[in-house]
Amino acid sequence: MWGTMCLLAVPTSIFAQAPPQPSNHYIGSDQCGLCHVDIYKNFYKNPHFKSIASGKEAPEKTGCEGCHGPGGDHMAAGGGAATIRAFSQMTPTQVLDTCLGCHSQDFSRANIRRSAHTEADVVCTNCHSIHGSAPDANPPKFLLAKKQAELCYGCHEPIRAQFSMPVKHRVNEGVIQCTDCHNPHGTFAASWGTGAGSNLEAASHNNEESCLKCHVDKRGPFVFEHASVRVEGCTACHVPHGSTNAKLLKRPVVFTVCLECHNGAGTFGRENLGVVIQSASHNMLDPRYQQCTLCHVRIHGSNSDARFLR
């Protein structure tokens, strides 16, 4: 005798497989850490870790894959630079585009695509290490690949010698840094001197702002302005890095600096700028008159005397 057979209706959905992941999908930074142990172990010290910690970013802007792209293919292939966004294999433009995907909001980087560095194919990874800052690089949050001065000297080697001169700004001693005066990401400031190329100075009206933020007593405005300061800036008389001359002057004796303008040879078009240059009225062969600033003591500008005597 046959028993009663019951047929149970079982939903077919419980046997259905999950849809396959696209081959190159986001796998999460934990998966990266299975192979890249040292990098992953120290990643929490990296400012880029904030993209994970915030919990607010989309996968394409989070952790390792925020910079290197989705890691699905890379993991399936067992590694290899061809299956991931490897910065060492990217063009300068690709590197810049990747970094600016997140780092485009700061005004100090607003002109980076037209900066002298970018035009020379010097981009982010030439100075920065995305996985962590060098031990002697300060501050760590900037992820510098080396100590800042050493990074700059890598290309600007002649500047290293200037900072070893008897009179200099104390960069080698760590008192100030190159970026206290220069913006390596580009600037909208005009260049030092007429017709000169961009030196990436921090933004200012006439390029003297980098100097005046330390030398505040020279800022003015003054009732009687020194025309060379107003028109050409500090480097009309001074060199910025280092010199064998006192006060970083361009020439060893003060009067030879002054005679570059006050020589009686004309105004060289400066009248168009509202500047009339007086020729020197003393005998410059007389040693008594060769230290102009002994009398013209307010040479950067005065509020009481048009000849800067007080």
Model-derived regions: residue spans:
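Short sequence/structural segments immediately N-terminal
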Residues: S13-R310
